[in-house]
Regions:
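Charged, alpha-helix-forming regions
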Residues: 1-315
């Protein structure tokens, strides 16, 4: 007991002496506690896409430069997409937005502060979106940012309760903030999302995608997956008229050509999670789950896969 008392006394004296001396060196102050940008450095994240551009056509499905102004209207929703000098951004360029939105949503889930302005590593973006990492990949990435910045969208779709009445760029701004000393290729990028997309993100107006989405080569296949994922819900199948599917896809192909492309996509069976069956008699497409257990339950409850009950949509 005496030894313990002495030790406590010594500790007390040391603490009192420390108060009269210069304070010990600690961590340097946080000089930027409220940064005006978000660093996209999260390693594990789920693929997230805003549900509005999944339902309605905002992007070109062709890799060829597309300079047409797009006008879309459905059930009171209007979208006008005007290309910039380099043409409309393609659905492949949308991968940049999916990556950014996914990072932001995961940060929100972790309670981290977020911002419309995002800093990211070009290499991480290329790897995460299943792209190459050669010099040409970086050139294409720069071109993608330019088209996203150049395109102007006008829409009455509200995001997080707000309507943006004037036209807006898909991204407000982008710049290279660091280059590789060895290759001169861009290493770090800063971009600012439109308020419209940022509001959709912080409002959690997003859906989770299968990570194999980035492995889809065809623009129409990517678009078909988006549409199916948006309208799917938890039903094992979803049926839609070809006219409506053609409209929602944003495809510039004729309706006849679109049917051919749809049947080709059905034959390729590349879509994650879903299969497609075309019914030429009703001129409808049926998307049904690749989950055999869910499909078996649907067949048991309805008696046949071919019935439209419970899964037809004219949304």
């Amino acid at each position: 007991m005496a030894v313990e008392t002495i030790r406590l006394t010594e500790l007390f004296e040391q603490a009192r002496a420390a108060q009269t001396q210069d304070p010990p060196r600690k961590l340097a102050p946080d000089r930027h506690p409220n940064r005006d940008f978000f660093v996209a450095d999260i390693l594990e994240w789920a693929l997230k896409d805003d549900r509005h551009s999944m339902e309605h056509p905002f992007f070109s499905l062709s890799k060829k430069p597309d300079h047409r102004v797009r006008h879309y209207e459905h059930n009171g929703i209007h979208v006008v997409a005007k290309p910039g000098a380099d043409g409309m951004p393609t659905i492949w360029y949308k991968d940049i937005l999916i990556y950014a939105v996914s990072q932001l949503v995961e940060a929100l889930n972790q309670g981290r502060p977020v911002s419309r302005t995002i800093r990211l590593k070009a290499y991480d973006l290329l790897i995460s979106t299943n792209r190459g990492t050669g010099g040409r990949a970086y050139d294409l990435l720069a071109a993608a940012f330019e088209r996203l910045k150049g395109a102007v969208i006008q829409t009455d779709i509200r995001t997080n309760g707000f309507r943006q009445r004037e036209g807006f760029n898909i991204i407000d701004h982008w710049k290279i903030i660091e280059r590789s000393p060895a290759t001169g290729l861009m290493a770090a990028i800063e971009m600012t999302l439109s308020e419209w997309l940022y509001n959709a993100t912080i409002g959690r107006e997003v859906l989770t995608l299968n990570r194999d989405y980035f492995r889809l080569d065809g623009g129409l296949e990517r678009r078909l997956y988006e549409i199916a994922r948006k309208h799917w819900g938890r039903q094992p199948k979803w049926t839609v008229s070809i006219d409506l599917l053609h409209k929602k896809s944003g495809s510039q192909a004729t309706l006849k050509k679109f049917r051919e492309l749809l049947k080709r996509a059905a034959g390729n069976d590349a879509l994650p999670d879903y299969r497609i069956r075309y019914n030429h008699e009703s001129d409808h497409a049926m998307f049904y789950t690749k989950d055999s257990a869910a499909l078996a339950r649907q067949i048991a409850s309805l008696g046949t896969l071919g019935t439209d009950s419970g899964g037809t949509s004219e949304l």
